[in-house]
Amino acid sequence: MEDRLYEGIAQQAGIAGCTLVDARMVRTGRAVALQVFIEKDETTAVTIEDCAAVSRQLSLWLDVENPIHGAYRLEVSSPGLDRPLKNLHDFERFKGSQAEIHLHGLTQGRRRLQGELLGVEDQKIVLKNAEGRWTFALDDIHKARLVPQW
């Protein structure tokens, strides 16, 4: 997704009183969906009204700016229990939670790790699992998400 589109979506979510967690274009068969994941703040759950407000705000902006060529479906929702971790603030905020991290390259023979987030130290993400303590730069991470505990 282009930076301009992502930044525009983040700005419109903010106007509607929410924060963008992630956005992505997903193709299923011939259909294309713009999936937008939002949160309210760290203590307030996203409601259906929040999703509707962001959807209305985004629809207006998308119609005027027309950054997406062709037909698409707009989907706005909360990120869910397995929310993505996108920035250093997320990794610090969810310290103590279980997370799964996929790396761009191999680190000690591993590309995927799961364990407890220990937070951020010296601008590096710290994860602990049965194999030890792991430290990564944000740029080393391809994708990361919380792993819900039942």
Curated annotation (Swiss-Prot):
Belongs to the RimP family. It is found in: Cytoplasm. GO terms for biological process: ribosomal small subunit assembly; translation. The keyword Cytoplasm applies. Keywords: Cytoplasm, Ribosome biogenesis. This is Ribosome maturation factor RimP. InterPro entries: Ribosome_maturation_RimP (IPR003728), RimP_C (IPR028998), RimP_C_sf (IPR036847), RimP_N (IPR028989), RimP_N_sf (IPR035956). It comes from Acidithiobacillus ferrooxidans (strain ATCC 23270 / DSM 14882 / CIP 104768 / NCIMB 8455) (Ferrobacillus ferrooxidans (strain ATCC 23270)). It comes from the Bacteria. HAMAP family: RimP. Pfam families: DUF150_C, RimP_N. The gene is rimP. The keyword Cytoplasm applies. CDD domains: YlxS_C (cd01734). One of its GO terms (cellular component) is cytosol. Required for maturation of 30S ribosomal subunits. SUPFAM superfamilies: YhbC-like, C-terminal domain, YhbC-like, N-terminal domain.
